[in-house]
Amino acid sequence: MMLLPIVLSACAASDEGKSITFTDDRGVASQPFPRNYRTEVLSFLKTYLNNPVGVRDAVIAEPVERVIGGRQRYVVCLRFSARESDGGYREPRERAMLFVDGRLDRILENAAEPCTGLAYAPFAELEKLTR
């Protein structure tokens, strides 16, 4: 019984730092364009944000291909200010949404590098979100 945790930890440690992915990883090969990126971003943020109502100053950039963690990914950058639990607002923050195989994979809270030099346009749909 005492050996079970040791055996399981050995299995977990034997991947040599490889990340777990459930998609077909093309590495540095080109990815398909995320055609429904706006809809996917809105659906994700509706569940991700503590309060999706009352978002301000929302802007979004068109998807661009970037190398993230040694892998080619489409990145959609956005900047917005979400309503806090006390009803106030912080300064708008930039976030990056990563797409794999044309589908939303994850969000990067620290988006300074992947979002450098992008042109933003208003994202009114995000400001109109409801619960």
Name the predicted role of every residue range:
Residues 1-4:
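Sec-dependent signal peptide recognition
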